[in-house]
Amino acid sequence: TDENSVEYGLKDKLFFQESAQYLEQLPQPFYAKFITVSNHFPFPEDEMNNTFTLDTGDETIDGYFNTARYADEALAEFFQYMKDAGLYDNTLFVLYGDHFGISSSRNETLAPLIGANPDLWGAYDDAMMQRVPFIIHNPGSGTGQISDVYGGQIDILPTVMHLLGVDTSAYVQLGQDLMSAQNEGIVVFRNGSIVTSEYTILGNTVYHTQTGTLAYQTEEVVEKVAQIRAQAELQLAISDQITNGDLLRFYTPDGFTPVDKSLHNYVDSPARLAEDIAELGNLNTSLYYTNNGVSSVPLYQTDAPEFPGNQVIADENVTHGQPVAVEAPAE
């Protein structure tokens, strides 16, 4: 319904909650990908979930922060469910944004919020705003850390595969393991811009990445930048050849079964899952099956006001307008 959806699909809290019924049916170990949409342009105002008030004079920026807060809350609920359902400790979580958050046309309005001077905002600052969150959470691995390695989404696959103990030497991969000492730390954008830990290259202009100051074109700088450009151009050329020539159709390593796209349709996915479960029989390793048919869905707790049984108290004195769980009315 319109109440439960935003521009591109279900609101995050409802999406995660409704996904639990499918997640518990997946044979373990499984790979599951969730694409959330609440924290996505145009960040529409949602009075039912307005838990973070900001007034910058730009509704898009205000909405960005409010929906980011909402997305955080949705993830917290999902993580709690994973713990309560007994899936958390044996799961590797990978969270990332697929592109920048706010259009560069609004960056000068955003600048004061991140401690920057809008009058001094320039191309380097725009480039830095292309960064996206990337989090790997491995329960039980000890104290976490923040890595200052430079990388892109192309590096996610080799990084995760190595964390899972997969030998990738037989595979063709364009990315690099972000945790490897041999990682070159180069990020190449489709428009030819390049970011490394040392230099940010935007057209013919070169900045020091750590300070944002212009890099003087000394012989050493020119030589290093030329080497970086050569690496970047090679990456883009290979990407173009693979994409434009559809070269993946020739890539069939040992043990790889090409995907038959005709067999995949989101509309009949639940029915196909049911068929797969029936075929497994006693070999089923899903959470639902190993729990002797007891569903974990009731363990999922959400304060989403749209969810049956939850209600928002419309009172200005209620902190942040937080939803309050109430019992469903008797029929």
Each language-model region and where it sits:
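Solvent-exposed soluble domains appended to multi-pass membrane proteins
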Residues: 1-331
